[in-house]
């Protein structure tokens, strides 16, 4: 209602946690493909800095204030996502030190993308009180020594820390989708669901599912964008597709840029477009794992 769009423009809010923006793209795509719409703006907005405290109703057996939604009936922990990452790390026998290269590499690639303006045409300039807003958590000098000093978040023996888990950010990202020919087209998109106890596996499993459904392989992909909410997600890609790390998160990922939950899926799509243009590629794959064991994957084609 604060935009210059007509008040007669239909709108809907989607809550699929981390996968929300990519799911909004899926919904827009299916509406257009079915003829319900001719065009749509899809994506998301997240303001983590204004995340409100909420309180359960007096009739609810749950009590007190909370900030984080309850993702499964059995788990009320506000640290559910961190705990899911920790479980996934141990399930796949990954050490803290094995995660270092993925973290450092993400920051280095993000720094290179920033220095070379690879994303400049995809980022709208934004200022507050005359001060230009920039990505604040890219660390060009991220190194193993710094990572080794980071304190565990889930007890002294845990691996998950502020280095191998993304920061929460404010952000907004959108794509315009229509039934007219453009520089990119959606080849296929699909949701996925699995065990919420190991939610970071959603990016890998949704990738496997969409490749199987489309009869494509990782060899066909020129660019892969996964939301690296945790470095274990990078490790899962490396273990599953070791020969394809060169096409993975080419411009850096959420470990460097941060993860504004509601819009990260649209950020993936925009990064995928920019990366396809930079490498003159054809197919790009985006995948994101979401809270509660959800996920979404998308394959786009550069025309």
Residue ranges of model-derived segments:
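Condensing-enzyme catalytic core mediating Claisen C-C bond formation in acyl metabolism
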Residues: 90, 144-201, 205, 209-213, ...
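N-terminal extracellular/periplasmic Venus flytrap/periplasmic-binding protein-like
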Residues: 98-183, 245-246
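Active-site-proximal alpha-helical scaffold in enzymes
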Residues: 15-46, 89-119, 175-180, 260-281, ...
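Flexible glycine-/small-residue-enriched beta->alpha junction loops
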Residues: 39-87
